[in-house]
Amino acid sequence: VIAEPERRLVLAYAPGAAAGQALSALWALDDKLAETVRTTSEPMLGQIRLQWWHDALVKLDGAPPPAEPVLEAVARDVLRDGVTGAAVGEIAQAWQALLQEELDAVTLKAFAQRGVRLFEIAGTLAGASPADPLALAGEGWALADLAGGLSDPREAAGARMIAEQALAEAAARRWSRNGRALGAMAHLARMDLAGVPFGSPRRTGRVLWHRLTGK
């Protein structure tokens, strides 16, 4: 999860208002799904609630959204340029992985699809280059976020290991101008893993350099 001031910074890098609105809508959806998992004590109930979100997103492909602000924003700002509700629904499916009893490598990879799909969809809507490492960055971003919230040291270490590798590969590439908001998210996640504190000038300076150079 990206803190609000850094969200505003990332949005400033989006290539136009429409791309920024799409990313904001995807963040709002991801926040809602995270809240669903966080406030669920019974895995079965959590699965039912996440499945509701998945099904509601899929239904947007054939019907207007219900009176729910997150779904309305997705329908208005995300479902264009070939992006479907079914594709967005895969983000909700990925969150279901956290309801498993044990977060092994397979489960972590399944959860990482949360970030992969979010980055790929946001990249499509921003006009990012096919060469931008969206999947790697999304995987690393999702698992870096997860690692910071896990209480089991072994599970946190597993998430961190996969995230570090994915983010290192994503950071080694030069991002297109239209992909740099997402590249900035990857760099911020990498600094989270490195323990660079929120609000540090190092964080702002790093993403500013990325905005200017794509690196």
Residue ranges and their predicted role:
Residues 57, 61-62, 82, 99, ...:
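Short alpha-helix boundary/capping elements
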Residues 81, 104-111:
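Short, surface-exposed loop/turn motifs that are enriched in glycine and acidic residues
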Residues 59, 104-105, 170-172:
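A short glycine/serine-rich beta->alpha loop
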